[in-house]
Regions:
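Lipid interaction determinants
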Residues: 15-17, 21-90, 94-174
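Bacterial N-terminal signal peptides that target proteins for export
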Residues: 2-13
Length: 174
């Protein structure tokens, strides 16, 4: 009887072992889906500029469109100054973006009454084209080289802040 019980248990164990081996051989290892790299690509429309004194500028006093796609960018900005003159910028360039670094190279720019009176096609001077990126609460934060601006990108758009001067609010439209 003990021999029969032992043989029965051994056979059951062998069947279980065979089933597990078959399952292991024929099952596929689950691999996690690859994570897509972080991206700030999109087309953004400037919704408003809040000045340090609380004044809010909205279109048509300020109008801008910023497109970033596949490592290329284009920015067009027009601001009606308090004295009625127009300040503007149109820039095109290249950029790279990762979770820890943003790099930017302005290929061409024309600026009118923006950084200084008159028209210039000189891009801001930079010693390093790259800046560190930090991530917090689903937002990417960095300061593009040479611009003196702090940006914070999220799914809905981004904000751009220049010191004690103003904060721009951009909405992602595409």
């Amino acid at each position: 009887m003990k021999t029969t019980l032992f043989a029965s248990r051994a056979a059951s164990g062998l069947i279980l072992l065979t089933a597990l081996a078959q399952w292991a051989v024929h099952s596929e290892v689950a691999t996690p889906a690859p994570l897509s790299p972080p991206s700030i690509d999109g087309t953004y429309e400037l919704m408003k500029r809040v000045m340090a004194n609380g004044t809010v500028l909205r279109p048509p006093s300020i109008v801008a469109l910023y497109t970033m796609a596949d490592g290329r960018f284009s920015l067009n900005l027009f601001v009606k100054n308090a004295d009625g003159t127009i300040a503007s910028e149109s820039s095109v360039g290249r950029y790279t973006f990762s979770a820890d670094k943003y790099c930017e190279w302005i290929v061409y720019t024309i600026r009118n009454n923006l950084d200084k009176p008159g028209v210039t096609n000189e891009a801001p001077a930079v010693t390093d084209h790259c800046a560190p990126v930090t991530s917090k609460d689903g937002r990417f934060n960095f300061s593009p080289p040479g611009e003196g601006v702090e940006v914070s990108f999220g799914a809905e758009g981004f904000t751009a802040k220049i010191g004690g001067e103003f904060v721009d609010r951009w909405r992602k439209i595409r």
